[in-house]
């Protein structure tokens, strides 16, 4: 069964789309404003797709989908909270828009999808809060060699500016490549307001299998502090390249035999670090 809702509620009287926990659907699409979605199981087909203002998706289970897990596309003032996403294609949770909170979700076993990649959370837009989520067990199996399963990923190719993003207090375990990767290969995220922090990455617990835990390429104004950045294959905890200027790297914990940060000359302007 496919379920689609296009009728909106209001701020004072939202629509409650609530399951008792025993309703299973092939895909669930909510293209409306001021809707609460709770307790559904989405399995085997499309995604839980959200688009609108004032949407809350909580305590849903999404697994073995073909087009992603939970996708909040063009959302505003919305919350994705306490959901479980397992074995989704391409990305467990993807958000795009303004003032979206992703909190206390469990994402695991994302597999390579249409673009060949497999990620925990992808994020695009501004005013985003990604807090206290657990992402785990995303392997390189099935992904083309050039691609990289990551916990948190953003990029500017085909997207408007991403800034004012807080990624705080998350756990990232047994993921094949990066804990955080931000790449500005199209424009260097140049549409972001000058001098505004793009990403604040604080207090996260990362145990990944890549060469670095944090990878910034042509992506300025990132604050990386007070994280555990660990993994068996680390060559450096943080890699900053290609004009990723005005970044901060401080007070992170990593292995004693691993460089805390590797930064190229083009990224050194405005760099704030004790190293």
Language-model segment annotations:
Residues 29-66, 77-86, 103, 168:
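Parallel beta-helix/beta-solenoid
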Residues 33, 53-55, 75-77, 98-101, ...:
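Short "repeat-start/strand-capping" segments in structured domains, especially the N-termini
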Residues 225, 235-275:
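Acidic, glycine- and Ser/Thr-rich low-complexity intrinsically disordered tracts
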Residues 2-38:
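Beta-solenoid repeat scaffold
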Residues 166, 171-172, 178:
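Oxyanion-binding "anion nests"
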Residues 2-4, 24-27, 44-49, 64-72, ...:
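Extracellular beta-strand/beta-solenoid scaffold signature
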